[in-house]
């Protein structure tokens, strides 16, 4: 491995160059593979799966949000450029997301411009079933191709985090449509069996990453051991040659 190469800065530069996190689903894996090959070539690593670099990038984003003092100025600049290109929480492009954004904008407009009849708004709030058909229709819309993850629902990473905050649900989710959609999703899409399968899948993924990391470390240690043995043998050969030159001639040589 070249000591002058900063692995973090190299990874960020490769992500800016190839942009695998911004590519459509059909081209994303190939782009990540190019990043992996270039990263292994310049750092001397032997990572076999691009998932390892994805995990590194996710942890860098978490560390960037928690403590930016851990980054150098050049790393901060590259990380800021990456986050500007790809927001951490992009707005969904489904019909449900459009309806929720429009409902939020309309609610802010109503707060700044109150209508003449508040009783009509109160009656509409007491009967939320009028929009149930809209919610069901929006839930049947297909998701965009680049947000589909094989075997795991695309919102699986966000919904458990929201549902785990029992006291802050009302603060995090303000729209009644989002509340109803989240409850319906948790009742139908995340039964206990699927939650157990998700936990097993996450554990298996972490295990594969750890095994890949250990394999790479063992390969590096093996290479260092071979280099060390080669250097020792070369030095022994030099010492043997010097000793043979310093050895006095025998009686047979004098005769």
From Swiss-Prot:
Keyword terms of this UniProt record: Activator, Transcription, Transcription regulation
The keyword Transcription is assigned to this record: yes
Gene encoding the protein: DAL82
Function: Positive regulator of allophanate-induced genes in S.cerevisiae.
Residues covered by region (Disordered): 87-149
GO molecular function: sequence-specific DNA binding
Statement: the UniProt record of this protein carries the keyword Ribosomal protein: no
Positions with biased composition (Basic and acidic residues): 128-138
Species: Saccharomyces cerevisiae (strain ATCC 204508 / S288c)
GO biological processes: allantoin catabolic process; positive regulation of transcription by RNA polymerase II
GO cellular component, one term: nucleus
Protein name: Protein DAL82
